[in-house]
Amino acid sequence: MKTIVLCVLVLAVGASMALAQPCVDAAKEVAPAMSAEAKADLEKKLDEARRTALTVPNGGDADSTIWYGRRTGYTGRYKDTIAIFTKAIARWPQDARLYRHRGHRYITLRCFDDAIKDLEQAAKLAKGRTDEVEPDGMPNARNIPTGTLQSNIWYHLGLAYYLKGDFKRALNAYKECMKVSKNNDMLAATSHWYYMALRRLEKNKDAERLLEPINGDFEVIENADYLKLLRLYRGEVKGEALMSEIGDKAETLGNASLGYGIGNWYLYNGDRDKAMDVFRKITAGNQWASFGYIAAEAELKR
């Protein structure tokens, strides 16, 4: 009898410890698929960022540490990235950038509650301060950064809520993001997720009004896929036409972000079976860290 009681206690303690385990410790981590050449380039840049961060007087500064963390994330070492930013936050707890970047990588690891906590804190710290352009770690074709600290805080916060299925709070974050989206690329990206949140809440009139600025003269530098989706929502292109671009006949889809937007369009237009098929194809692919993949994964779990 004592043996049985002891076993029950051990199992209970083990279950309690499992429940208390931080999300990041239990999270799966999948490295991005890339060529050997691309991997070597990322590792070289990471090594440079690491050496810079470690050789700055007094153990580094926030700027060099941020680059060290970001470049660690580009290689797929997401847990290491979070550890770098966690250590940095202990040194510079008032730096909104650190919470913004750690929040992003919490999203990558599907730790949405942790991401929300960080991004809410980042928003508080950035409130009332002059916005700043956020340099790109992977520059676009024109080498023109399109995001700012505040737009990226609100964008990722909206995404974290969206991925949890909390579309009302996602909507509030995207409203704030629209206020600080000062170029077409950020407007396209924000409008895409904002529109989808509106449709999921059946606010169809508001969703239609949101698309009004996306006219024929609207151009972007790097967010071409989001612009294609906005034109789909406007009725200017067909879902089947966009699907054919990314291999609708294959077992997987070559573009998770575009695929998710199309799948979601099928979903809120009443074709759930087709939507689920698209989501399954996305998650059968290799774009594990992309927002489209994470969103498709979340839909399949709802």
Protein language model annotation of sequence segments:
Residues 19-67, 74-75:
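N-terminal leader/linker segments that initiate helical-solenoid repeat arrays
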